[in-house]
């Protein structure tokens, strides 16, 4: 019995000693008082970015939050974001990898979970110069327009069917199919879901792999922050090995199909898998890196665009004035006898402002993935010890009344008054990050979101379900790394163009 008491007392004593040492040696940012062992884990509310923003109101724009024994520093304004992402970028460019992230990424052999160093620089160069180059994005544009027009076709068929006339439509389902098919076609050259919504055999396996990966990662969540608890939550080596083998088996099969197709045709297509296989020797890319990069694209692109568009549509239904103004611009530029293409974007400034304003108020990833300090560094006059994690609260930065007029108001006109970049150059608006770890696919995400919004608004009018006022729409968020609406948006849809403009425009590339 005495031994059972000694162990937890010793652990608590060690933790208190370590915390005291950190506080005496370093001038740490202020924050809520941590509890022994667990730190602030039990004080954090489910929607973390809102919780951290509330704490910033009490303690200031830079705060310390302890996840168990790990110091996490949260910054919540644009000046501090600039320090983290520009002035001290290289010192804060490493990545904290949980045990599950380490397994999924083969210890950082991909891009997202790689530490800053020669490997990261190499694979980022591949992404920037090869995978997401303007030339490749333009070559793959027909895929995006195919999937967006397929969505329009699907929404039209749903809302004009006899049994659905006048009823609300659950938009998330249609947005999710676009995002899913778009990213799998870009990455793998595969459309796993057909026009009837039926998923093929490889698609079923792909979806199962994604869901199993999420399940495995979630099973270790608490133990990641409290190392001495890991004996209670052991890493299931067998389960992770089985998952990795399953993922690799599917990916290798797709890679083999593309290799064989290149041999027969004598040339490569523009899909990411073809590009990586073609560039393998030039950049000395291992198979682990190719597989890791492909799954990075899937992970980063499968949900985020659909989430952004759902939030934007919710705001447009709540703000009919803005919806009407976008439609007037679309009618003026495109008319009522053709459909929009990405070539029209430059003539649709208000649509682009709506896209920006939605991403300002509702960034799909409201907390940046943590940047790990690879050396001791000062931010905002406080010490950030080596090994600490630094998070930028993108959501709080974009709602800061010190830099935004009426920050809680959905007002796209603000971007007509001042052109604000959202690809990492203006630290007030950071939906895609900034600095060495800025998202290389930012332009792809912007183009797809603007295309989806433009088509939905050009083809249809959107109103709340019968009996609901616009202001009654639930604008709360679900907890999680990405921010779904707590209540999926439902709306009554009315077509506004001639019926022949609601057909899918297929692209076989």
UniProtKB/Swiss-Prot annotation:
Primary gene name: CYP98A2
Cellular compartments per GO CC: membrane
EC number, UniProt record: 1.14.-.-
Name of a matching Pfam family: p450
Enzyme type, top EC level: oxidoreductase
A GO molecular function held by the record: oxidoreductase activity, acting on paired donors, with incorporation or reduction of molecular oxygen, NAD(P)H as one donor, and incorporation of one atom of oxygen
Family: Belongs to the cytochrome P450 family.
Location of this chain's protein in the cell: Membrane
Originating organism: Glycine max
Membrane topology of this protein: Single-pass membrane protein
Chain positions recorded as heme binding sites: 439
Keywords: Heme, Iron, Membrane, Metal-binding, Monooxygenase, Oxidoreductase, Transmembrane, Transmembrane helix
Transmembrane segments: 2-21
Name of the molecule in the record: Cytochrome P450 98A2
Cofactor(s) the protein requires to work: heme
Main subcellular location: membrane
InterPro entries registered for this protein in UniProt: Cyt_P450, Cyt_P450_CS, Cyt_P450_E_grp-I, Cyt_P450_sf
């Amino acid at each position: 019995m005495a031994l059972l008491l000694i162990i937890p007392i010793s652990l608590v004593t060690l933790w208190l000693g370590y915390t005291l040492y950190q506080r005496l040696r370093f001038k740490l940012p202020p924050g809520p008082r941590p509890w022994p062992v667990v730190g602030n884990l039990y004080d954090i509310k489910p929607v973390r970015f809102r919780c951290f923003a509330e704490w910033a109101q009490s303690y200031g724009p830079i705060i310390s939050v302890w996840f168990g024994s790990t110091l996490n520093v949260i910054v919540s304004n644009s000046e501090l974001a600039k320090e983290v992402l520009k002035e001290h970028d290289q010192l804060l460019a490493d990545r904290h990898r949980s045990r599950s992230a380490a397994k999924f990424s083969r210890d950082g052999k991909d891009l997202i979970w790689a530490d800053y160093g020669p490997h990261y620089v190499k694979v980022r160069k591949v992404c920037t110069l090869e995978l997401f180059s303007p030339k490749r994005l333009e070559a793959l544009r027909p895929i995006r327009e195919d999937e967006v027009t397929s969505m329009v076709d699907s929404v039209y068929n749903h809302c004009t069917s006899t049994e659905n006339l006048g009823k609300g439509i659950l938009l998330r389902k249609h947005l999710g199919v676009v995002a899913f098919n778009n990213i799998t076609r870009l990455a793998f050259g595969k459309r796993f879901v057909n026009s009837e919504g039926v998923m093929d055999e490889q698609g079923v396996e792909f979806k199962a792999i994604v869901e199993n990966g999420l399940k495995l990662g979630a099973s270790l969540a608490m133990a990641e922050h409290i190392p001495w608890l890991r004996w209670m939550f052991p890493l299931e080596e067998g389960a992770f090995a089985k998952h990795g083998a399953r993922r690799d088996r599917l990916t290798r099969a797709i890679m083999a199909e593309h290799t064989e197709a290149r041999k027969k045709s004598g040339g490569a297509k523009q899909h990411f898998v073809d590009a990586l296989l073609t560039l393998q020797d030039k950049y000395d890319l291992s198979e682990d890196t190719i597989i890791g990069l492909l799954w990075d694209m899937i992970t980063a692109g499968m949900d985020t665009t659909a989430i952004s568009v759902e939030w934007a549509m919710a705001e447009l239904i709540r703000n009919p004035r803005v919806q009407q103004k976008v439609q007037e611009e679309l009618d003026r530029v495109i008319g009522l006898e053709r459909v929009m293409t990405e070539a029209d974007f430059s003539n649709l400034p208000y649509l682009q402002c709506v896209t920006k304003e939605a991403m300002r108020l509702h960034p799909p990833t409201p907390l940046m993935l943590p940047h790990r300090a690879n050396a001791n560094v000062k931010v905002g006059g406080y010490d950030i010890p080596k090994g600490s994690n630094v998070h930028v609260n993108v959501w709080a930065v974009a709602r800061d009344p010190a830099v935004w007029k009426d920050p809680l108001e959905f007002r796209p006109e603000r971007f007509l008054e001042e052109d604000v970049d959202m690809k990492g150059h203006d630290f007030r608006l950071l939906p895609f990050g900034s600095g060495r770890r800025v998202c290389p696919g930012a332009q792809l995400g912007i183009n797809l979101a603007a295309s989806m919004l433009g088509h939905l608004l050009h083809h249809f009018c959107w109103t709340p379900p019968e009996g609901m006022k616009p202001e009654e729409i639930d604008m709360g968020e679900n907890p999680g790394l990405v921010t779904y609406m707590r209540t999926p948006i439902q709306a009554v849809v009315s077509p506004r163009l001639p019926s022949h403009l609601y057909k899918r425009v297929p692209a076989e590339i």
